[in-house]
UniProtKB/Swiss-Prot annotation:
Belongs to the pancreatic ribonuclease family. Disulfide bonds join 26-84, 40-95, 58-110, 65-72. The lineage of its organism: Eukaryota, Metazoa, Chordata, Craniata, Vertebrata. Monomer. Interacts with and forms tight 1:1 complexes with RNH1. Dimerization of two such complexes may occur. Interaction with RNH1 inhibits this protein. Its EC number is 4.6.1.18. This is Ribonuclease pancreatic. Endonuclease that catalyzes the cleavage of RNA on the 3' side of pyrimidine nucleotides. Acts on single-stranded and double-stranded RNA. The active site is at residues 12, 119. Residues 1-13 have a biased composition (Basic and acidic residues). Keywords: Disulfide bond, Endonuclease, Glycoprotein, Hydrolase, Lyase, Nuclease, Secreted. One of its GO terms (biological process) is defense response to Gram-positive bacterium. Transmembrane segments: none annotated. InterPro entries: RNaseA, RNaseA-like_dom_sf, RNaseA_AS, RNaseA_domain. GO terms for molecular function: lyase activity; nucleic acid binding; ribonuclease A activity.
Length: 124
């Protein structure tokens, strides 16, 4: 079974491309990372930074998560991210996404030993 840390890697990490100017990026990646299997995941963010840099966020600025938990952390610096949002015409199983390139601070929830990101909370 996939651990929470592994799920975070699958759903949110893309170290291979620093920036993809490809408007088709989300359509391809959401399928490739199994986020369109039983439904279209409505919103998802990919982070284009090294695994080490993203794991390091767990020791940066402690903030409160959207759900009220206190194990969220905001990155000190901005990161290259891609936002994938389902389009109005998207209908399972033909999930369709709009791709947006952004440079923002990320907020992740961390847990475990080693203390690693397990949930992508927001970008600011």
């Amino acid at each position: 079974k996939e651990t929470a840390a592994e799920k975070f890697q699958r759903q949110h990490m893309d170290t291979s491309s620093s920036l993809s100017n490809d408007s088709n990026y989300c359509n391809q990646m959401m399928v490739r990372r199994n986020m369109t299997q039983d439904r279209c995941k409505p919103v998802n963010t990919f982070v284009h930074e090294s695994e080490a840099d993203v794991k390091a966020v767990c020791s940066q600025k402690n903030v409160t998560c959207k759900n009220g938990q206190t194990n969220c952390y905001q990155s000190n610096s901005t990161m290259h991210i891609t936002d994938c949002r389902e389009t109005g015409s998207s209908k399972y199983p033909n999930c369709a996404y709009k791709t947006s390139q952004l440079q923002k601070h990320i907020i992740v929830a961390c847990e475990g030993d080693p203390y690693v990101p397990v949930h992508y909370d927001a970008s600011v």
